[in-house]
């Protein structure tokens, strides 16, 4: 039988009750399909152009709505999962569940939070940020006069917020500012009382046979991890030294032998280890004992590089780095122009643990630098990444990411090399330098340079200008199957990267590309005289380059004035990191939506 119009109406109302409202008349939350976090986005996440929060007390999806504008087309699909602290949050752009317009690139996440606690925190950061509006800040690695984003910061009006007004969540204003981070204690440790600690460091001419926690020999031995690999520390170091003595090719880039290493480093070291002068040659020195306690390397700095971490909203496979900087000594323990940097990954995988570790660095300020208490606390920090088996998932169980060298002591020009640990042989091997093509692609390199090679570089820069200017690019291993990334980096006096006049269309792209290379950062782009951390004689702290402590440089091509002060940038970064993962999901979410990792290796 046909139903009457009244019956159809009643059934329709009942259907609406079942599908969208529930029988008590309350609207049901809009469902979210299973959505996984994309770990591949850790180093290249989508960055929200703006983030706002809005209070909606009667919405069934939640009471706080985070609205993130990524721009249309930035994120593919209608749902985007991200970790806020230790909890997954799914944002939506399907026009449902509190989202505005479907497919407009403005994603919404519904949270259920304590309104009073949230309002109090918003009030606190609104008040605290007033003092920072005129303070210099950083765009990428460059210091600018002030953070223009803070101009959007408005006083928190609780009544307006409770009534539904949106409040902006500014990346620089997600927590009360921490202003007392100590660069000397917690970021770049060069104090003589630390780097010449008599129990943890070495002085091969006056304190031979040192095997303390921060000595070159101890760190290399732990890197070899004999108990796990069967490779002794001595064998590990000998193979590394031998790699300098023969010519080789890395990714199509020829590396000549640096045989002066034999006379500068190897010969004096083998003699100090007990062999008679004249009893060995460059061909058979490796048959003689090499005492790692007499290694001719002086610790010059211990460096916190947590700022190199990825975006924890997607995963924490890259928690930043911890570094030891060594200067090479000659046979009389005088410093040479040859630095060796051990760059370890921080083996931490959880947000809360990473924040606690950042606070360990920060808390070093409570001790007198160079005191017994300070040095013990610092060793507790460095053991996390430097000890044997610090990261069992990596080759040799070592957390080492790479060893980098920068020297002219072995011959002109200044040359930078990079070494990784091989998972099969358990030895160090030469690998490509990062973010720098082979020098043949640089019009500023010593002749002969082919215009066709330079054009390859210029075309790549032009094609990737947007990512390069935002420091989100990665120089590829090859282009069209032809090797591109360099096997070494040569830093010439006054050197930088460029093409023929007019070939690189955007001068900012040229600058950022050149700045991100080893040679550009250690050269003309920052007015650095090759070394960011100098090698001083014993009893003297290392001299730091202007790029670290503050310098204004005119662009070598455009003439644009730029100011760098990277330790200040790292100071701000450590302060912001310590605000994370405190159970304030709203603010953790806003942070990961706006945090852009840096790709620069320096």
Task: Annotate the PLM regions.
Residues 66-72:
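Aromatic/hydrophobic beta-strand junction motif of beta-rich domains
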Residues 98-113:
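Aromatic sugar-binding surface patches on proteins
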Residues 8-19:
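Bacterial N-terminal signal peptides
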Residues 515-525:
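The canonical Cys-X-X-Cys-His
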Residues 53-62:
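Short, solvent-exposed loop/linker segments at the N-terminal edge
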Residues 17-47, 602:
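Bacterial Sec-dependent N-terminal signal peptides
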Residues 138-490, 525, 552-556, 562-568, ...:
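Conserved small-residue
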Residues 87-98:
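Solvent-exposed serine/threonine-rich low-complexity stretches and specific carbohydrate-binding patches
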């Amino acid at each position: 039988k046909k139903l009457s119009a009244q019956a159809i109406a009643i059934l329709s109302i009942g259907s609406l009750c079942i599908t969208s409202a529930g029988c008590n008349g309350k609207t049901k939350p809009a469902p979210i399909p299973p959505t996984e976090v994309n770990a591949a986005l850790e180093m290249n996440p989508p960055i929200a152009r703006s983030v706002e929060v809005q209070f909606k007390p009667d919405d069934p999806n939640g009471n706080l709505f985070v609205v993130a504008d990524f721009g249309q087309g930035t994120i593919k699909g209608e749902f985007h999962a991200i970790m806020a602290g230790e909890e997954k949050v799914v944002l939506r752009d399907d026009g449902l569940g509190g989202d505005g317009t479907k497919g407009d690139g403005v994603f919404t996440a519904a949270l259920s939070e304590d309104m009073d606690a949230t309002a109090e925190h918003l009030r606190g950061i609104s008040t605290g940020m007033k003092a920072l509006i005129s303070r210099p800040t950083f765009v990428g690695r460059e210091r600018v006069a002030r953070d223009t984003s803070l101009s959007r910061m408005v006083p928190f009006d609780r009544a307006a917020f409770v009534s539904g007004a949106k409040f902006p969540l500014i990346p620089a204003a997600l927590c009360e500012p921490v202003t007392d981070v100590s660069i000397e204690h917690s970021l770049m440790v060069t104090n003589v009382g630390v780097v010449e600690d008599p129990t943890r460091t070495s002085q091969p001419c006056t304190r031979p046979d040192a095997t303390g926690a921060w000595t070159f020999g101890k760190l290399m031995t732990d890197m070899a991890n004999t108990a796990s690999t069967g490779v002794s520390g001595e064998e590990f170091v000998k193979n590394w030294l031998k790699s300098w003595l023969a010519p080789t090719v890395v990714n199509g880039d020829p590396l000549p032998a640096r045989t002066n290493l034999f006379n500068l480093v190897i010969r004096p070291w083998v003699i100090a280890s007990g062999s008679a002068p004249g009893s060995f040659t460059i061909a058979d020195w490796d048959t003689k004992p090499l005492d790692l306690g007499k290694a001719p390397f002086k610790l010059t700095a211990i460096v916190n590089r947590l700022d190199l971490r990825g975006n924890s909203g997607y995963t924490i496979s890259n928690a930043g780095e911890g570094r030891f900087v060594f200067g090479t000594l000659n046979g009389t323990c005088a410093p040479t122009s040859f630095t060796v940097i051990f760059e370890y990954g921080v083996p931490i995988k959880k947000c809360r643990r990473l924040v606690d570790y950042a606070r360990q660095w920060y808390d070093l300020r409570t001790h007198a630098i160079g005191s017994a208490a300070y040095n013990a606390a610092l060793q507790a920090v460095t053991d996390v990444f430097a000890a044997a088996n610090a990261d069992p998932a990596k080759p040799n169980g070592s957390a080492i990411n790479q060893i980098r060298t920068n020297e002219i002591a072995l011959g002109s020009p200044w040359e930078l090399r990079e070494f990784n640990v091989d998972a099969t042989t358990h030895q160090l091997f030469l690998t490509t330098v990062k973010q720098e093509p082979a020098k043949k692609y640089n019009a500023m390199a010593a002749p002969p340079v082919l215009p066709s090679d330079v054009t390859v570089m210029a075309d790549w820069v032009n094609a990737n200008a947007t990512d390069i200017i935002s420091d989100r690019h990665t120089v590829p291993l090859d282009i069209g199957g032809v090797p591109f990334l360099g096997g070494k980096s040569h830093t010439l006096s006054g050197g930088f990267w460029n093409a023929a006049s007019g070939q690189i269309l955007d001068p900012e792209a040229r600058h950022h590309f050149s700045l991100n290379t080893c040679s550009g950062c250690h050269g003309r782009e920052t007015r650095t005289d090759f070394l960011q951390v100098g090698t001083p004689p014993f009893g003297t702290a290392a001299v730091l380059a202007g790029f670290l402590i503050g310098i204004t440089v005119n662009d070598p091509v455009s003439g644009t004035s730029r100011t760098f002060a990277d330790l200040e940038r790292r100071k701000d970064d450590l302060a912001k990191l310590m605000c994370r993962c405190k159970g304030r999901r709203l603010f953790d979410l806003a942070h990961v939506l706006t945090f852009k990792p840096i790709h620069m290796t320096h």
